């Protein structure tokens, strides 16, 4: 699978919890080209190696978080984002040497088939880390390297990750006098673009 090279700060993380009330729309597109032969028969051919993931997500953030997110989005408008696939949330029940204990990891399509990276996020302490995936079992996720952060068991979420780019301008709207909603749409990079 062809993926962008991730080095240092090239990947912009999204360490924010989604607004589950509005739902998360994860869809798939597959681009093809139609060819017509001299006998007027039609044939479709794929223009990409597999389907492209598109994710529409809303975040409900306080003023400081909304300001930080808008700064990250302005900085990263033409860069690669690490987009967590929120519908495939797993809770980490324990940590070991490059191991994360989870339940039913093999039940998640994106984690099993397309994930090269995972995103760990502990909302209370705001810790997060992007980790390359080395192996996967039903009750364990193996990271390529030792985790840099000290996460807490049963308070840390792990998501499969895809590399994406913003397809529309971020929409920032007031929700209350202290909360804001930020609406984003990401498309996956495939085969270099």
Give the residues covered by each predicted segment.
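Extracellular/virion structural assembly segments
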Residues: 1-138, 142-193
């Amino acid at each position: 699978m062809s993926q962008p090279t991730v080095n240092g700060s090239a990947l912009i993380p999204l360490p924010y919890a989604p607004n589950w009330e509005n739902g998360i729309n994860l869809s798939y597109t597959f681009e093809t080209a139609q060819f017509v032969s001299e006998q007027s028969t039609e044939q479709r051919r794929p223009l990409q190696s597999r389907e492209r993931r598109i994710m529409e997500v809303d975040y409900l953030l306080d003023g400081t978080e909304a300001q930080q997110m808008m700064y990250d989005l302005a900085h990263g408008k033409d860069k690669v984002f690490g987009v967590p696939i929120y519908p495939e949330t797993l809770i980490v029940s324990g940590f070991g040497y490059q191991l994360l204990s989870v339940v039913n990891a093999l039940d998640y399509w994106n984690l099993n088939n397309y994930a090269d990276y995972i995103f760990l996020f502990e909302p209370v302490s705001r810790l997060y880390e992007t980790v390359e995936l080395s192996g996967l079992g039903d009750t364990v996720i193996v990271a390529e390297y030792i985790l840099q952060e000290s996460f807490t068991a049963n308070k840390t979420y792990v998501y499969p990750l895809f590399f994406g780019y913003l397809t529309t301008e971020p929409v920032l709207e007031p929700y209350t006098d202290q909360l804001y909603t930020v609406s984003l749409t990401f498309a996956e990079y495939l085969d270099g673009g």
